[in-house]
């Protein structure tokens, strides 16, 4: 089973969905996640369990009860909160827990004392003795070939400061091609303001009502 604690469908959630979808060809997979993101997950089993605080004994008990009832022997936790919960599950059961670090953290305490840790970047695994580096995958069918698709250039991602969409917009001043930014997030308002400020409304659009499968 895969455990996600967030209530929005962003990069981590998409990664988990694609991973579980592929792994379901070999074994049964289920994603434990917030009900708010169920609509984004197709063709993979999913269930919603109220998690709340990562330290709540009641919430931990709910999750543990579900795992035992469904005879789940391996819990793959994604992110710091899910990994903290997984670590507590490991303390009180024989369920194996694997954590994946998806981004830089101030400290790696949530990922300590689990059975195995996966990092998509070698630097993320510093100080973790049982860490394994597995880089993010890509579809090698593209082989670096230029797309034959007609239409605007697409940039897809969650609209957060760390993604650098503001730099992308600023770089578009001298580019004639049209750009569609597909995503949603807290930076949407400021990015729209930046597009207006640079008078790029005719070149750049932000599309928020587009789910994973339609992309």
Regions from the language model: what does each represent?
Residues 5-8, 156-165, 185-186, 210:
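Short donor-sugar binding/catalytic loops of nucleotide-sugar-dependent glycosyltransferases
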Residues 192-210:
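Nucleotide-activated donor-binding/catalytic signature segment of Leloir-type glycosyltransferases, i.e.
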Residues 47, 113-143:
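Donor nucleotide-sugar binding/catalytic pocket of nucleotide-sugar-dependent glycosyltransferases
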Residues 32-37, 156, 178-191, 208-209:
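Glycosyltransferase donor-sugar binding loop
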Residues 1, 145-163, 169-176, 180:
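Conserved donor-binding/catalytic core segment of Leloir-type glycosyltransferases
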Residues 56, 77-83, 101:
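Short His-centered aromatic/hydrophobic patch
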């Amino acid at each position: 089973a895969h455990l996600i604690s967030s209530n929005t469908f962003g990069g981590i959630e998409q990664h988990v969905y694609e991973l579980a979808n592929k792994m379901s060809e070999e074994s049964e997979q289920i994603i434990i996640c917030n009900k708010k993101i169920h609509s984004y997950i197709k063709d993979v089993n999913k269930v919603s369990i109220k998690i709340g605080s990562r330290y709540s004994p009641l919430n931990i008990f709910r999750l543990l009860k579900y795992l035992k009832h469904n005879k789940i022997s391996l819990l793959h936790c994604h992110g710091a909160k899910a990994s903290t919960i997984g670590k507590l599950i490991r303390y009180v059961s024989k369920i194996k827990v694997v954590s994946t670090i998806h981004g830089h953290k101030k400290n790696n305490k949530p990922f300590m004392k689990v059975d195995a840790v996966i990092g998509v970047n070698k630097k993320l695994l510093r100080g973790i003795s049982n860490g394994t580096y597995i880089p993010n995958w890509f579809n090698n069918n593209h082989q670096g070939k230029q797309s034959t698709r007609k239409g605007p250039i697409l940039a897809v991602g969650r609209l957060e400061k760390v993604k650098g969409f503001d730099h992308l917009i600023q770089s578009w001043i001298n580019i004639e091609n049209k750009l569609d930014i597909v995503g949603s997030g807290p930076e949407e308002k400021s990015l729209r303001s930046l597009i207006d400020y640079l008078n790029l409304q005719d070149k750049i659009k932000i599309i928020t009502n587009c789910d994973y499968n339609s992309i």
